[in-house]
Amino acid sequence: MIRKSKKITKQRGSRTCGYGEAKKHRGAGHRGGRGNAGHQKHKWLSVCKFNPEYFGKYGFNRNPCLIKKLETINVGELEEYVLKYKDAFKLKDGKVVVNATEIGFEKILGKGRISTAMVVKAVEFSEGAKEKIEAAGGEFVEL
């Protein structure tokens, strides 16, 4: 059986019950406010020392109108797509003709393997994609 009296019971009659001066037990006023309160006022030195980049603006954001966002697909994924929907594509000289813009892609990237000879038409191609398409016996056409 534990016979330990509570802290408050021990401190009865001591006027401040372990909180030091009476003013110190009056809410957040003793701490200068709750949380980040006062960071631009009386706690400014701690901001300068520990988190100087907290206030102010740094760098810049490009205008979204100037950012060219192209829908991309990798060569390996394109071949899988072509093999899955063979009937939808035309043949020309034994090669599958793929117009990437018609299926919703503007740029062809070079990740993956390709073994099907294809004529790929797109707005842009990466260098790796060009090499892989030609190595498989196909050709690329930039629109």
UniProtKB/Swiss-Prot annotation:
Keywords: Ribonucleoprotein, Ribosomal protein, RNA-binding, rRNA-binding. Part of the 50S ribosomal subunit. GO terms for biological process: translation. GO terms for cellular component: cytosolic large ribosomal subunit. Binds to the 23S rRNA. It comes from Methanococcus vannielii (strain ATCC 35089 / DSM 1224 / JCM 13029 / OCM 148 / SB). SUPFAM superfamilies: Ribosomal proteins L15p and L18e (SSF52080). One of its GO terms (molecular function) is rRNA binding. Gene3D superfamilies: 3.100.10.10, 4.10.990.10. Residues 1-38 are annotated as: Disordered. Residues 1-13, 23-38 have a biased composition (Basic residues). Belongs to the universal ribosomal protein uL15 family. It comes from the Archaea. InterPro entries: Rbsml_uL15_N, Ribosomal_uL15, Ribosomal_uL15/eL18, Ribosomal_uL15/eL18_sf, Ribosomal_uL15_CS. This is Large ribosomal subunit protein uL15.
